[in-house]
Regions:
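Membrane-interface "cap" regions at the ends of multi-pass membrane proteins
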Residues: 61-93, 120-127, 131-144, 148-155, ...
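Transmembrane helix-boundary motif of multi-pass solute transporters/channels
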Residues: 77-114, 294-300, 310-314, 318-319, ...
C-alpha cells in the first residue's frame, strides 16, 4: 500500500529549515502523536518547536537535512570580497617588482592579455563549481560528481590555503611592522633601509609578534561569518584601498621626472618581448586572480543562482588590473624621479620605496599611508584563505564557526612559525636547498596552483556535461550563448595549454 508522508516546519527569522540527509528516522503511524514524543532522539539540529504536524509512515522515512547555508547580503559584497582576495600582495608587491625586472610596459601588456584570455576563464570555472555545488570547496566537487575522486581537487585547494596563509601571514606581519615603524620614527631620511628590513625579518620576537597580530585580525573578521565578518570588512577596506591608491598616484605623478616612470610602465620597449617575459606574465596572470587554491570556489558557493557570475568575474578582473596599474603609477614615477632602478626585485616596497618616500615632502606620512593600503590588501586576501579552510571544516554548520576559526587560526600560526624563523635563527635549516618559507612558496605557486587551475579547467570543460555547464553557468546572466561556448572552449583548449607551460616553466624545465 502506497503511503505518503508530509513534514512541515516553521522557520523563524534567523532559523532556517533543517532537513536531515541520509538519516532514516522511525515515524509513528499515529498522526495524533507529536513527533517530539515519537522520536527517542531528535536529530541534532531539529528543534521540537519547529515541527508542526505530519502524516506518517509505519516504516522508516528518509528526510533530507538542509543546513543553514549563509550567503552574501548583496552582489557588491561578493565582488568586493572576491576582488580583495584576488588583489592582495600579488598586485601591490609582486606585480611592480616583476614588471620592473621584465621591461615594464611589455610585461604589463602581456599580463593584461593573458589575464583576459586565460586567467579569467579559469576564475569563472571556479565560480561555476562553487555556485552550482553550493557548498565548500570539497563538497562542491562531491555534489557535482558524487562517488568520484574529484573532491581531492578541493582538498588540495583547502590544504594549499592552510599552508599559504601560514607563510603569507609572515609577510603580513612585516607589513604591519613597517606601519608601526612609520609612526615610531624608525623610517626617516638617512636611515639604512636595507639594514632595517634585515632586522625586521630576522628578529624572532618581532617577526612572530606581528605574525600573531596579523592572524588575530584575520581570525577576528572571519569568525564573524560571511555577511557580518568578511563582507562587512571588505566594504570598508576595499574602497579605502582605492582612495588611498588614487591619492598616492596623483602625488607620485606630480613629481619632477615622473613621466619617465609612466613611459616605463605604458610605453613598450619591444626588446623585452621574448619567451621568458611571456611565461612570467602568464604566471602573474594566474597568481593575480587567486585561482588554483579553491578560494574562489568557496566564495562563489555563497553566491545566489540569480546573480550574474560573468559580470561579477569581469568586474573583479578589471578591479585587479586597475590596482596593478595604480601600483605601477605610484611606484615607478617615484622611483624614476629620484634616480632609483625599477628592477629591484622583492625588496622594492621594503627597501627602495622607503628611500623614495623620504625624498618627498611629508614622506613619512605618505609612506605610512602606502603601507596601510598594503595592509588592507594583505588582509582581504588572508580572509579568503582562512574562510576556504573554515568552510570545509564546519560544512555549513555556522554554530561551529567561532570555535573552528580560533582553533584553525592558531594552528596556522603555529605551522607558520618555521617560515617566520627561516629568515633568522633557522636560516641555515634547508630542505631540498630551500628554507621553509621558500619551500612552501615553491610548493604552492609552482606546483599546487597550476595543478589546481588545470584540474578546474578539465573538470568544467571535459568532465561535466556540456549542456549542464552552459545552463548552470549562464543562470542569472544575460551573456549570449555564443560567449558561453567561447568560454567553455577556452577552458577546453587554450587554458590547459597555457597552464601546462607555466607549470613546466615553474619546475625549471623550460
Amino acid at each position: 500500500m502506497q503511503q505518503t508522508a508530509k513534514l512541515y516546519s516553521f522557520i523563524g527569522k534567523k532559523h532556517p529549515e533543517f532537513i536531515l540527509q541520509n538519516k532514516k528516522i522511525p515515524i509513528s503511524p499515529d498522526i495524533t502523536q507529536p513527533i517530539g514524543k515519537v522520536l527517542q532522539r531528535l536529530p541534532r539540529l531539529v528543534l521540537p518547536h519547529q515541527v508542526l504536524c505530519y502524516n506518517a509512515l509505519p516504516s522508516h522515512f528518509l528526510i533530507n537535512f538542509m543546513s543553514n547555508h549563509t550567503s552574501w547580503s548583496s552582489k557588491i559584497g561578493f565582488v568586493l570580497a572576491a576582488a580583495g582576495s584576488a588583489i592582495g600582495l600579488g598586485a601591490i608587491w609582486k606585480f611592480p617588482y616583476t614588471a620592473g625586472t621584465n621591461g615594464g610596459a611589455v610585461f604589463f601588456l602581456l599580463f593584461l592579455i593573458f589575464t583576459i584570455l586565460v586567467a579569467l576563464p579559469v576564475q569563472l570555472a571556479e565560480f561555476y563549481i562553487g555556485r552550482t555545488g553550493g557548498k565548500n570547496a570539497v563538497d562542491s566537487f562531491r555534489v557535482l560528481r558524487p562517488g568520484t575522486q574529484w573532491l581531492w581537487v578541493g582538498r588540495m585547494g583547502v590544504a594549499a590555503c592552510f599552508i599559504l596563509l601560514s607563510f603569507y601571514s609572515v609577510v603580513g606581519g612585516w607589513v604591519l611592522n613597517y606601519v608601526v615603524h612609520s609612526f615610531t620614527g624608525a623610517i626617516h631620511a638617512g636611515a639604512d633601509f636595507e639594514a632595517l628590513f634585515g632586522t625586521t625579518i630576522s628578529n624572532p620576537a618581532g617577526s612572530l609578534s606581528y605574525q600573531a597580530l596579523f592572524m588575530l585580525i584575520t581570525v577576528w573578521v572571519v569568525k564573524g561569518g560571511i555577511s557580518d565578518g568578511i563582507e562587512k570588512a571588505n566594504r570598508y577596506l576595499m574602497p579605502g584601498l582605492f582612495i588611498l591608491f588614487i591619492a598616492l598616484a596623483i602625488r607620485s605623478l606630480t613629481l619632477p621626472g615622473a613621466m619617465e616612470g609612466v613611459s616605463f610602465l605604458l610605453k613598450p620597449n619591444w626588446s623585452y618581448f621574448k619567451a621568458d617575459t611571456m611565461i612570467t606574465a602568464l604566471g602573474q596572470a594566474f597568481f593575480a586572480l587567486s585561482i588554483g587554491v579553491s578560494a574562489m570556489i568557496t566564495y562563489a558557493s555563497y553566491l545566489g543562482k540569480d546573480q550574474d557570475m560573468f559580470r561579477s568575474g569581469h568586474t573583479i578582473m578589471w578591479m585587479n588590473l586597475l590596482v596593478s596599474l595604480l601600483a605601477g603609477l605610484v611606484i615607478f614615477p617615484a622611483v624614476f624621479a629620484f634616480g632609483f632602478e625599477p628592477s629591484q626585485g622583492p625588496g622594492l616596497i621594503f627597501i627602495v620605496l622607503p628611500a623614495v618616500f623620504m625624498k618627498m615632502p611629508f614622506g613619512t606620512v605618505l609612506f605610512a599611508v602606502f603601507m596601510l593600503l598594503v595592509v588592507f590588501a594583505t588582509l582581504t586576501s588572508a580572509f579568503s584563505m582562512l574562510e576556504t579552510v573554515i568552510a570545509s571544516t564546519i560544512r555549513q554548520d555556522e554554530r561551529k564557526r567561532k570555535k573552528h576559526t580560533w582553533l584553525i587560526g592558531t594552528a596556522i600560526f603555529i605551522v607558520g612559525i618555521p617560515s617566520a624563523l627561516s629568515f633568522g635563527i633557522w636560516s641555515e635549516f634547508k630542505v631540498f636547498g630551500k628554507t621553509i618559507f621558500d619551500l612552501w612558496d615553491y610548493l604552492i605557486s609552482a606546483v599546487i596552483m597550476p595543478i589546481g587551475a588545470l584540474s578546474v579547467s578539465i573538470f568544467t570543460a571535459w568532465i561535466q556535461d556540456k549542456q549542464s555547464v552552459l545552463k548552470d553557468a549562464g543562470s542569472g546572466s544575460t551573456v549570449p550563448r555564443a560567449v558561453l561556448l567561447l568560454w567553455l572552449n577556452t577552458l577546453r583548449y587554450l587554458a590547459p595549454i597555457a597552464i601546462i607551460i607555466v607549470f613546466i616553466n615553474s619546475l625549471g624545465i623550460l
